[in-house]
């Protein structure tokens, strides 16, 4: 079974070969999948080759051949899209956000509508799935500038950060983070997780908010910050 990024890359290569007869360059693939580095493309190509979907032709630059496509092509996978986290797991921050009551969407003058991008699953990171589920109204003072989205919490991996099952976290899109921030982090261009951001020398540590989950250490090229926690909404 292919991950979404593997699936998207395979379809992008296939479409380019059908259109021009020439495989895309690594720069083109990186840009199409909105990856931070070519190393992510190398890993995806290696995974596709190991699974028998493509092969690299020897002694030829940019030589890729698509051997087969998945038996079932899911709708919406034909064109790569920018990453939008929708299934991620909880993390821990320096301080817990104070929960806010859910806003009344009927009062358009008192709320700002932002997209809910999916659910936060407790446990280890899960493959990032890109889709918008619905919208939610939040208090205007929770939106301090920039683009925002919401994620629904499911599970216990954020309990010591004061974030519980059923809560909705508000995320501000950013690629920067300070130590101790709760961030949405993209790991290896494929998996998303909500964790406490730390630096350990040249490495990055992603800490859980539950002692049952170990801190995970990654090289800096393996982690890409996608957003920072700025608020929380709780329904009663």
UniProtKB/Swiss-Prot annotation:
Q: Where is this site: Cleavage?
A: 122-123
DNA-binding region ranges: 26-46
Give one Pfam family: LexA_DNA_bind
* GO BP, one annotated term: negative regulation of DNA-templated transcription
Q: Which EC number applies?
A: 3.4.21.88
- Which stretches does the entry tag as region Disordered? 84-107
Main EC class the enzyme belongs to: hydrolase
The lineage's top-level taxon is: Bacteria
Keywords, comma-separated and alphabetical: Autocatalytic cleavage, DNA damage, DNA repair, DNA replication, DNA-binding, Hydrolase, Repressor, SOS response, Transcription, Transcription regulation
Q: Which InterPro entries match?
A: LexA (IPR006200), LexA-like (IPR039418), LexA/Signal_pep-like_sf (IPR036286), LexA_DNA-bd_dom (IPR006199), LexA_repressor (IPR050077), Peptidase_S24_LexA (IPR006197), Peptidase_S24_S26A/B/C (IPR015927), WH-like_DNA-bd_sf (IPR036388)
Catalytic residues in the record? 157 (for autocatalytic cleavage activity), 195 (for autocatalytic cleavage activity)
Q: Note the CDD domains from the entry.
A: S24_LexA-like
Catalytically driven reaction(s): Hydrolysis of Ala-|-Gly bond in repressor LexA
Q: Where is the signal peptide?
A: none
Q: Which GO terms describe its molecular function?
A: DNA binding; serine-type endopeptidase activity
Similarity comment? Belongs to the peptidase S24 family.
Role, per record: Represses a number of genes involved in the response to DNA damage (SOS response), including recA and lexA. In the presence of single-stranded DNA, RecA interacts with LexA causing an autocatalytic cleavage which disrupts the DNA-binding part of LexA, leading to derepression of the SOS regulon and eventually DNA repair.
Per UniProt, subunit arrangement is: Homodimer.
Please state what the protein is called. Answer: LexA repressor
- Species name: Chelativorans sp. (strain BNC1)
Q: Lineage of the native species?
A: Bacteria, Pseudomonadati, Pseudomonadota, Alphaproteobacteria, Hyphomicrobiales
Q: Which gene encodes it?
A: lexA
């Amino acid at each position: 079974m292919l991950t979404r990024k593997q699936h998207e890359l395979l379809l992008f290569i296939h479409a380019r070969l059908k259109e021009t007869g020439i495989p895309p360059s690594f720069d083109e693939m990186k840009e199409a999948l909105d990856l931070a580095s070519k190393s992510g493309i190398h890993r995806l190509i290696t995974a596709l080759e190991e699974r028998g979907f493509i092969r690299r032709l020897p002694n030829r630059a940019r030589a890729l051949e698509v051997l087969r496509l998945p038996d079932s092509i899911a709708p919406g996978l034909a064109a790569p899209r920018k990453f939008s986290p929708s299934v991620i797991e909880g993390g821990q921050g320096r301080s817990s956000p104070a929960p806010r009551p859910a806003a009344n969407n009927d009062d358009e003058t008192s709320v700002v509508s932002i997209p809910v991008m999916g659910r936060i699953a407790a446990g280890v990171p899960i493959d990032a799935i890109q889709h918008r589920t619905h919208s939610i109204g939040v208090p205007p003072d929770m939106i301090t500038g920039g683009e925002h989205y919401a994620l629904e919490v499911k599970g216990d991996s954020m309990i010591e950060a004061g974030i519980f099952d059923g809560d909705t976290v508000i995320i501000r899109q950013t690629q920067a983070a300070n130590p101790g921030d709760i961030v949405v982090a993209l790991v290896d261009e494929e998996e998303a997780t909500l964790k406490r951001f730390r630096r350990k020398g040249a490495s990055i540590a992603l800490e859980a908010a539950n002692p049952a989950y170990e801190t995970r250490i990654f090289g800096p090229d393996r982690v890409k910050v996608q957003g920072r926690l700025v608020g929380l909404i709780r329904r009663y």
